[in-house]
Amino acid sequence: MKGDVEMKKLLPIVAIATLVLSACAQTGSAQGGPAKVTVTMSEWSVKMTQTTLPAGQVTFALKNDGKLTHELAILKTDLPHNKIPARVEDATKVQEIGIIGEIEDVEAGLTKTDVFDLVPGNYVLICNEVSHYQAGMHLAFVVK
C-alpha cells in the first residue's frame, strides 16, 4: 500500500521531467550552434536542402558539383530572384544589392563553408561568375 502511494507521487514528477527533456531535445540543435544548409551548384542550377531558414547564424556549405568554378552570393532583397539588375560596367554580372556575404571561387568537386548572420526577410542566392546568373544560377529563400 505504501509503495502505491509512493508511485502515485512519483508519476507526476516523471511526467514533468519527460516533457521538459523532450522540449529541450526539440530546441537543442538551434541552441547548439548555427543552423546548417547545403547549397549545391552545377552548370546551370542552384539547389538548397531547404528554402526556409531560421533567423540567426546559418552555416552555408557550398558544394560544387559542376565542372566550372562557382561562387555563392547571398543578397537580402525583395526583388524576384530572376530580376536582379545587371551591373552597368559589366553586364555579364549582376548588382550585388543588399549583399550579406559570399563564398567565392569554389572549384569543381570542392565544398566550402561559411557562417552568415541572417535577419528575417527575403533573400536570393546567386552565382555571380561571368554570365552564370543569366544562365539560371539563382534561387530565392526566406528567413523567418
Language model region names:
Residues 81-118:
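Extracytoplasmic beta-sandwich strand-turn segments characteristic of Greek-key/jelly-roll folds
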Residues 33-57:
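N-terminal edge beta-strand
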Residues 1-6:
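Short, Lys/Arg-enriched N-terminal segments with co-localized hydrophobic residues
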